């Protein structure tokens, strides 16, 4: 059994460059949001709270905590039978380091207009970064893989599972000392529409037809994202490029997940 999901065979140079650019920018925008001190997205409230709590005993940087949490979340993939892609591993390894590097060079700002401008740039940049690395098609982030794994096991719909996870980490992070503020609300309102706008434009389209095995399908047209039918044996050939009825390919989930990727884009970032 393969430990990693297969890497798409076409356009690999562009995929890897786009993945690296997206992850570096993602970490930089996370550092910008911290310096804006206007509130963070739910997972980063959790990271910040854990950092504040654990530093009572062990001196760990914010970026180191991000990396540790990513590894712990990846371990939760095992019972869910999810396979990470190379992009998933790169996500866990790069973002925390880049966030720390950004915090090391970016000063703390006290002027409110400057902080608002910084937060605005961070949210827009974060959406661009997310669209870049998700669009590379090399695997979802650890946290989104946890979500889709739970959905595939029938725990609930994407909206229910994602909302439950994010409210939980937000509450725990806030209790531990993470910053919740107007930036948290702005991020929640803006990130979905921005990703929905950017992702089709940054998705790496396949240059050759691909064979895609479908393991689970909705029970019927209009079935909810958690509804599944029996396994289908066989493959479906999806043509990309000219003549493709869907010119914007969706993100590839290499494990059988009965979810609608559109909902992932609309609900938030792909980390």
Report the location of each language-model feature.
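Core subunits and conserved enzymes of cellular information-processing
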Residues: 1-243, 247-270
């Amino acid at each position: 059994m393969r430990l990693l999901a297969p890497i798409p065979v076409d356009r690999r140079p562009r995929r890897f460059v786009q993945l690296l650019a997206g992850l570096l920018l993602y970490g930089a925008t996370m550092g910008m949001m911290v310096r804006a001190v206007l509130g963070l997205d739910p997972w980063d409230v959790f990271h910040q709270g854990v950092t504040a709590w654990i530093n009572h005993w062990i001196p760990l940087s914010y970026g180191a905590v991000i990396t540790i949490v990513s590894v712990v979340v990846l371990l939760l993939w095992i019972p869910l039978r999810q396979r990470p892609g190379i992009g998933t591993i790169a996500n866990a390894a790069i973002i925390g380091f880049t966030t720390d590097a950004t915090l090391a060079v970016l000063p703390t700002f006290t002027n409110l207009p400057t902080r608002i401008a910084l937060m605005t740039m961070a949210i827009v940049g974060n959406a661009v970064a997310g669209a870049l690395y998700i669009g590379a098609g090399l695997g979802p982030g650890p946290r989104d893989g946890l979500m889709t794994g739970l959905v595939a096991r029938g725990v609930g719909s994407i909206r229910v599972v994602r909302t439950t996870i994010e409210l939980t980490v937000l509450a725990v992070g806030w209790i531990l000392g993470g910053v919740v503020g107007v930036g948290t609300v702005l991020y929640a309102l803006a990130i979905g529409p921005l990703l929905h706008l950017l992702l089709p434009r940054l998705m790496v389209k396949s240059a050759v037809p691909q064979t895609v095995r479908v393991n689970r399908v909705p029970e019927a047209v209009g079935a909810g994202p958690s509804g599944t039918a029996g396994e289908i044996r066989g493959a479906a050939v999806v043509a990309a490029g000219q003549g493709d009825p869907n010119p914007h390919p969706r993100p590839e989930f290499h494990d059988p997940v009965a979810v609608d990727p559109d909902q992932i884009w609309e609900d938030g970032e792909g980390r």
